[in-house]
Amino acid sequence: MLYTLTAFSDGGDIFNLFRYLTFRAGAAFFTALIFGFLFGRPLIDFLRRKQGKGQPIRDDGPATHFAKAGTPTMGGLLILSSLVVSTLLWARLDNPYVWIVLLVTVAFGLIGFADDYAKVKKQNTKGVSGRVRFVIGLVIAALAATAAAWSHPPDLTLQLAMPFFKDALVNLGWFFVPFAMVVIVGAANAVNLTDGLDGLAIMPVMIAGTTLGVIAYVVGNFNLTDYLGVHFVPGTGELLIFTSALVGGGLGFLWYNAPPAAVFMGDTGSLALGGALGAIAVCTKHEIVLAIVGGLFVTEALSVIIQVLYFKRTGRRVFLMAPIHHHFEKKGWAEPQIVIRFWIISLILALIGLSTLKLR
């Protein structure tokens, strides 16, 4: 929004700063961070008053989780509000990729909000039917994938970019749309499954968001793509504003979500942030790299899939409990130990993902 003020700039005033992407990215980060610090405590107090008993705790979960009873959920509202406000304030609103990612984030956030609301109201862990959430998510992802394909340059519209190879593209035809749908919905649900311990999901999301922000900046810069041998997608650099706001809002939330958490992210936050990561990957044509950068989320999701399929087939379990972070809890690992080690893994995977820009 503030970018429009550059029209009134003569090149020598403060409005000229708004032309620079890096300046606006930094401003978006601090705007979201300050927003989170200012409104975090009032929101938590409001949620505690409205929710009473807070988020229901699974009866079959680790015994240590019963001490968390009464903790309010829907903390993702803090991330979403700071993210949306900051992005609208600092991003160019004539950029289609900004709107695609922003609308996907809000739409999945609404799905998560409905699920959290149902859980709190019924005081059970069921919430909205998984099938209903999945179908609505597919519809949102289909619209986003189609919009992204429409916004891409003609030579990239239905292409899948391959990492580690210079300008390597695979033409998926119209299979690109269902593929992109799987990426967006899969990312949303994978982050949702990861959000099971205090601080576990938000830091890997911020790490992945930072990585995708760098990738978006590179992919949207012709000189950098020409040097690195990466496909050029004009306009994606503006997504750096979104990812900067995501990290700022995420840090503001982590201030209150750090163990012992004063508030849980809930599906409101996890589905929204996962959907955002998937949408950014689709817009930047880095869907495969997302699987590397978000390898922790992929592992969490696969642990659930493997557990369910193996149990249905044999009546036995591969893991003591799924998702896999609960398996380590059952083995006696302390919660902070699991969280920090998973953060380290996320950072390593992010560095590997970034290396794909150069290793070609």
Curated annotation (Swiss-Prot):
Superkingdom: Bacteria
EC number: 2.7.8.13
Subcellular location per the Swiss-Prot or TrEMBL entry: Cell inner membrane
Gene Ontology terms: cellular component: plasma membrane
Top EC group: transferase
Gene Ontology molecular functions: metal ion binding; phospho-N-acetylmuramoyl-pentapeptide-transferase activity; UDP-N-acetylmuramoyl-L-alanyl-D-glutamyl-meso-2,6-diaminopimelyl-D-alanyl-D-alanine:undecaprenyl-phosphate transferase activity
Pathway: Cell wall biogenesis; peptidoglycan biosynthesis
Cofactor: Mg(2+)
InterPro entries reported in the protein's UniProt record: Glycosyl_transferase_4, PNAcMuramoyl-5peptid_Trfase, PNAcMuramoyl-5peptid_Trfase_CS
Keywords, comma-separated and alphabetical: Cell cycle, Cell division, Cell inner membrane, Cell membrane, Cell shape, Cell wall biogenesis/degradation, Magnesium, Membrane, Metal-binding, Peptidoglycan synthesis, Transferase, Transmembrane, Transmembrane helix
GO terms, biological process: cell division; cell wall organization; peptidoglycan biosynthetic process; regulation of cell shape
Transmembrane segments: 27-47, 71-91, 93-113, 134-154, 168-188, 199-219, 239-259, 262-282, 288-308, 337-357
Bilayer disposition of the protein: Multi-pass membrane protein
Catalytic reaction(s) noted: UDP-N-acetyl-alpha-D-muramoyl-L-alanyl-gamma-D-glutamyl-meso-2,6-diaminopimeloyl-D-alanyl-D-alanine + di-trans,octa-cis-undecaprenyl phosphate = di-trans,octa-cis-undecaprenyl diphospho-N-acetyl-alpha-D-muramoyl-L-alanyl-D-glutamyl-meso-2,6-diaminopimeloyl-D-alanyl-D-alanine + UMP
Family classification: Belongs to the glycosyltransferase 4 family. MraY subfamily.
Role played: Catalyzes the initial step of the lipid cycle reactions in the biosynthesis of the cell wall peptidoglycan: transfers peptidoglycan precursor phospho-MurNAc-pentapeptide from UDP-MurNAc-pentapeptide onto the lipid carrier undecaprenyl phosphate, yielding undecaprenyl-pyrophosphoryl-MurNAc-pentapeptide, known as lipid I.
Name by which UniProt lists this protein: Phospho-N-acetylmuramoyl-pentapeptide-transferase
Organism: Cereibacter sphaeroides (strain ATCC 17025 / ATH 2.4.3)
Gene that this sequence comes from: mraY
